[in-house]
Design a protein with these regions (language model features):
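Short helices/loops that flank or line small-molecule/ion binding pockets
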Residues: 76-92, 104-108, 243-253
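C-terminal segment of classical bacterial N-terminal signal peptides
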Residues: 17-26
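A ligand-binding cleft/hinge motif common to bilobed small-molecule-binding domains
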Residues: 103-106, 256-275
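Extracytoplasmic ligand-binding site segments that recognize negatively charged/polar headgroups
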Residues: 38, 42-48, 69, 73, ...
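Mature extracytoplasmic/periplasmic domains
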Residues: 287-288, 292-354
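Extracellular/periplasmic bilobal clamshell ligand-binding domains
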Residues: 339-377
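Periplasmic-binding protein-like
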Residues: 141-144, 224-227, 274-295
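Early extracytoplasmic/lumenal segment of secretory-pathway proteins
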Residues: 29-100
Length: 377
């Protein structure tokens, strides 16, 4: 195991340690790439157990140093430090970011502006995904789905309205995790909030912080508070994260819950989720999903190395690992370019139609707002 991960240096530490104290000279290509991951542990595992070892097999001269921030708990602090490093012309201690803040960084002009000359494999990525990234580079995708126990739920709800009615008709059999703890619960909360907004307002919140529109979340908070006595526990308490939601499903303690497509597929493959747990998409509106973005910091010290890593990730070899490995993710290049075995079951995939989550600033306010407006109310 040590040999397998010889090139991986995992730094799970206070966020402040992720930033250098002074400016440093640019590193030569083929040295250290500082990767900051703001996500759940399955993304951490994807990088450290699959992507980095495989990348190092063909690029042995790179040492990838990982800093992990679970579920973006320190996104606001990290963003502030990046801005400060730019303003003071100091080394941010980060070259590449995988996390929800990437589009915010891009909109603020803090990301390296890439092109297909620097990253040739971008030519295979749909232009709409690149444009939506605001300077971020899409490298994988996933979708929040509604998981249900097919033994107990013969006709699962297919719309948000039907789901809300089902929850009230089946007390204690539905749950979702706290939005700050994971994206599946966050997606459910955003979807309820969006159900009370116009299409134009939803589109705005996906790209721009808007306090006026946020004020209209009040109707959504009211709906969510009204579910407290009907969700698992029936006292306004919720699972702490994505994994806790999956655990309740696997043990049969709940029959219905929102889950990440990649996480539920991984659990079924690993045998930790019963095969009678199925998934379905809902509409009116749908749960959120779409690509995850990588951002190359404009003032990072190893932009060339970050470009090499991203170009490899966008190759068929890199995308096959995302689709067929433990991640069970969705590709951002045409399925026709993937290994046929890896692509089995996703031939009709169109990730360009997935509904995106809010931009980071709005998403953070969803998380904090839910914590004060919903639990125990």
């Amino acid at each position: 195991m040590k040999a397998k991960f010889a090139k991986v240096v995992a730094v799970i530490a206070a966020i402040g340690l992720a930033f250098g104290a002074s400016a440093a000279p640019a590193r030569a290509a083929g040295s250290t790439i500082n990767l900051y991951i703001s996500a759940d542990t399955n993304i951490q595992d994807l990088w450290q157990k699959t992507l980095i070892p495989e990348f190092n097999k063909v690029n042995p001269n790179y040492n990838i140093v990982v800093t992990f921030d679970r579920n973006g708990a320190n996104d606001a602090q990290t963003l502030a430090k990046i801005i400060a490093s730019r303003d003071t012309r100091r080394n941010p201690g980060i070259d590449l970011i995988d996390g929800g803040m990437v589009t915010t960084l891009g909109a603020a002009g803090l990301l390296y502006r890439f092109n297909t000359v620097a990253i040739p494999n971008l030519k295979d990525v749909p232009k709409v995904l690149i444009e939506n990234g605001k300077g971020g580079i899409p490298y994988r995708a996933s979708q929040v789905l509604l998981a249900y126990n097919s033994t107990n739920v013969k006709t699962p709800p297919k719309t948000l309205t039907a789901l809300l009615a089902w929850i009230k008709a089946n007390p204690g059999k539905f749950t979702y995790n706290a939005p700050a703890g994971g994206g599946s619960g966050y997606s459910f909360v955003q979807t309820v909030l969006d159900s009370q907004l116009t299409a134009a307002e939803i589109k705005t919140l996906a790209t721009t912080e808007d306090k006026t529109i946020q004020a209209k979340w009040s109707k959504g908070w009211e709906i969510l508070r009204g579910l407290n006595k009907f969700t698992y526990g029936q006292n306004g308490t919720y699972p702490v994260n994505n994994a806790a939601t999956l655990d309740l499903l696997s043990k049969g303690l709940v029959d219905v819950a929102p889950v990440w497509s990649d996480q539920i597929a991984s659990a079924v493959k690993a045998g930790t989720m019963p095969k009678n747990i199925k998934t379905i998409s809902i509409s009116g509106p749908s749960f959120t999903g779409g690509p995850a973005y990588l951002g190359i910091l404009a003032n990072g010290t190893n932009r060339p190395g970050a470009r090499v890593l991203i170009n490899w990730l966008l190759s068929p070899a890199g995308q096959n690992l995302i689709v067929a490995g433990s991640m069970n993710g969705l590709p951002v290049i045409p399925v026709s370019k993937l290994d046929p075995v890896a692509a089995a079951g996703i031939a009709d995939l169109d990730i360009t139609t997935m509904r995106p989550p809010y931009v980071s600033a709005n998403a953070n306010n969803v998380r904090s707002g839910w914590a004060t407006e919903v639990p125990g109310k």
